[in-house]
Amino acid sequence: MVPPITSDEFCETSGCFGDSANLHTTLERLKININSDAKKLVDTNGDLKKHQRFLRIAKVTSLRSKDPNTQVGCVIVDKDNCIVSVGYNGFPIGVDDDVFRWDKEDPEDNKHLYVVHAEMNAIINKRCTTLHDCTVYVTLFPCNKCAQMLIQSRVKKVYFLENRDELAFRASKKMLDHARLPYEQIVMPQEAYVIEL
């Protein structure tokens, strides 16, 4: 059984992102609390436990999104298994949720025109100079635009939870395959999403 996320991990991940200073402070705390025991994450299941742990953090991060339909979280980890960035889908800084709605019906107010995706936010808010050789953990397989950014950032691999059979995701797979950027879906048991408060 995968151990539940502790209240400390939840608070560290869910209460941040008010501004970039808050993000950097929280990432520093995450690095200490989450990554100090990174070596313990590898067990008889190989790296599976480590991947599940970072995907759980991505899942908790997704709870920060105000999107009523699709909450996505992303965690980027360096070669030492230290978190260098997190992101979730939402409107750009300074864009009011009350003015810009999460609508998909009206073409001019369609949320897809305005929302910054979790992967994009994580890339923009990184705490390092480069993402070269970093690993990405995301709750939803990256769309074609996010795949472009991940390829350009030269990340090493993408792990994801959920996949969709839609044009943007098929195009993404085609690009990732051609760029030889590996991706892998991790199936997690339901109890892996339990959060202890």
Curated annotation (Swiss-Prot):
It comes from the Eukaryota. The active site is at 119 (proton donor). Zn(2+) binds at residues 117, 143, 146. CDD domains: deoxycytidylate_deaminase (cd01286). Its EC number is 3.5.4.12. GO terms for molecular function: dCMP deaminase activity; zinc ion binding. It catalyses: dCMP + H2O + H(+) = dUMP + NH4(+). One of its GO terms (cellular component) is cytoplasm. Residues 49-183 form the CMP/dCMP-type deaminase domain. PROSITE patterns: CYT_DCMP_DEAMINASES_1, CYT_DCMP_DEAMINASES_2. One of its GO terms (biological process) is cytidine deamination. It is an enzyme of class 3 (hydrolase). Keywords: Hydrolase, Metal-binding, Nucleotide biosynthesis, Zinc. Its cofactor is Zn(2+). Belongs to the cytidine and deoxycytidylate deaminase family. Supplies the nucleotide substrate for thymidylate synthetase. This is Probable deoxycytidylate deaminase. The lineage of its organism: Eukaryota, Metazoa, Ecdysozoa, Nematoda, Chromadorea.
